Amino acid sequence: MEKFLDINEIKKIIPHRYPFLLVDKITELEEGKSAVGYKNVTANEYFFNGHFPEEPVMPGVLIIEALAQVGAVAILSKEEFKGKIAYFGGINKAKFRKKVVPGDVLKLSIDLTKIKGVAGVGKAVATVDGKVAAEAELLFVIGK
């Protein structure tokens, strides 16, 4: 189950690139089932220039996107989906519980709960220092 992917290996699986690649490393990967990744949130993030200049907070939508990218790595590691693209198909039950600020290390965990055909559902949780920052149910659709 333990499988480490650095940024270069992540870029071989998902098409995201700077400034929209929001995962620095994957530390756990169970192919087609689950993954855990990390994002080191620094004061140099482009989005802090406008969100918010006097009180920088990582936008919740980008936390969800980071979770979706980890989910994409998990689902695209499944043999039948290798080399394809995972699209964000939907989001349910999103909750934001803690601000994410410069200096935080965002732990991004996803468990794929259902895969049927080219669609999947995952339970996603983002934490900082063991405290839940955001959680949601994410839906994926596999493209070409």
From Swiss-Prot:
One of its GO terms (biological process) is fatty acid biosynthetic process. InterPro entries: FabA_FabZ (IPR013114), FabZ (IPR010084), HotDog_dom_sf (IPR029069). Transmembrane segments: none annotated. One of its GO terms (molecular function) is (3R)-hydroxyacyl-[acyl-carrier-protein] dehydratase activity. GO terms for cellular component: cytoplasm; membrane. Its EC number is 4.2.1.59. SUPFAM superfamilies: Thioesterase/thiol ester dehydrase-isomerase. The keyword Ribosomal protein does not apply. It catalyses: a (3R)-hydroxyacyl-[ACP] = a (2E)-enoyl-[ACP] + H2O. The keyword Hydrolase does not apply. It comes from the Bacteria. Coiled coil: none annotated. The active site is at H51. Its main location: cytoplasm. Keywords: Cytoplasm, Lipid A biosynthesis, Lipid biosynthesis, Lipid metabolism, Lyase. It is found in: Cytoplasm. PANTHER family: 3-HYDROXYACYL-[ACYL-CARRIER-PROTEIN] DEHYDRATASE. Involved in unsaturated fatty acids biosynthesis. Catalyzes the dehydration of short chain beta-hydroxyacyl-ACPs and long chain saturated and unsaturated beta-hydroxyacyl-ACPs. Belongs to the thioester dehydratase family. FabZ subfamily. This is 3-hydroxyacyl-[acyl-carrier-protein] dehydratase FabZ.
